[in-house]
Regions:
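PRPP-associated nucleotide enzymes
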Residues: 1-146
Length: 146
């Protein structure tokens, strides 16, 4: 497979395209999550363009490396309520909008891992509610789709 090299201007242009796309949808994330390693740079650029904070999440499936599970991100996405007074244990009004960014989407396995991880970490029995999270509260973006 031939490698394709991108200039800094190419990367900035692709990040601006992502920002323009979510602006057209009138959707604004509360924060951006960069998938380490390759997603950190575009996530940081996008977070600066949107003036929102940026977080990192380690998912390295390719090299049999360990992945980190960030339960608090799943709780943000779901609107989890850690209060016994709340019967439902989640509140859609508390959901944070999260843009997850990676550099390359080859097979979709990284994003599938993230979906499985977050759903298993936070109220996994609420599958219907989780289905409203993906694509609404949590959106995914990559610079390159193979």
């Amino acid at each position: 497979m031939n490698k394709i090299y991108y200039s800094w201007q190419d990367i900035e242009h692709q990040c601006q395209s992502i920002v323009n796309s979510i602006a057209r949808e009138q959707w604004r994330p509360d924060y951006v999550v960069g998938i380490t390693r390759g997603g950190n740079i575009p996530a940081t650029i996008i977070s600066h363009m949107l003036n929102v904070r940026c977080e990192a999440l380690k998912i390295a499936l390719r090299d049999n490396a360990e992945c980190e599970s960030n339960c608090w991100m799943a709780e943000d996405a779901f609107g989890y309520v850690d209060d016994p007074e709340y019967q439902a244990r989640w509140d859609p009004d508390l959901r944070k909008k999260i843009l997850v960014v990676d550099d390359i989407n080859d097979t979709g396995e990284t994003l599938n891992w993230l979906i499985r991880d977050w759903q298993s970490a936070c109220l996994p029995q609420e599958e219907y509610a989780w289905n409203t999270v993906w694509g609404n509260t949590v959106k995914f973006a990559s610079l390159v789709d193979n």
